[in-house]
Amino acid sequence: MTKNTLPTISMLSKDSDQAFVRSLHEYGFAALTDHPLDMIRVHQIYDDWQVFFDSKATFQFQFNKDTQDGYFGLADAESAKGSAVQDFKEYFHFYPAGRCPSDLRANLLTYYHAAEAFAKTLLAWVERHSPTDICDGYLEPLSSMIDASQSSLLRILHYPT
């Protein structure tokens, strides 16, 4: 049963792991504060990528159909499930080993690694509070499943105005 007000969960609270998993059960997602991601870096990434999306450099990084990295323009955007109407967005798929404008790579890579470490923490919380019969079905710890993954990506979204 869902509730009407999404709780904000501080990662500094003693029961943040339990509150996070409870929020996933009740709402399907969670709102976390006091997380380890550097919001100054996040805002800098938004600013830097806005310049990229406004430039013709996007054409030098058209997405690669085989690797799925690079720039996806408005014409390439996906549609919501069951809808024929494409989303009004453009985006860039970043993989650490993939293509990226050289002047944007270092900041994005630093953020990618921080987000990956954060994801491992959240996955460990989910595992810690999963029922035993569910955990028994895991082939490995949830937090290990993203180790050295070649398929984890960072998507930089832009909604044109």
Enumerate the predicted regions with their spans.
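Peripheral, non-catalytic segments flanking oxidoreductase cores
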Residues: 1-161
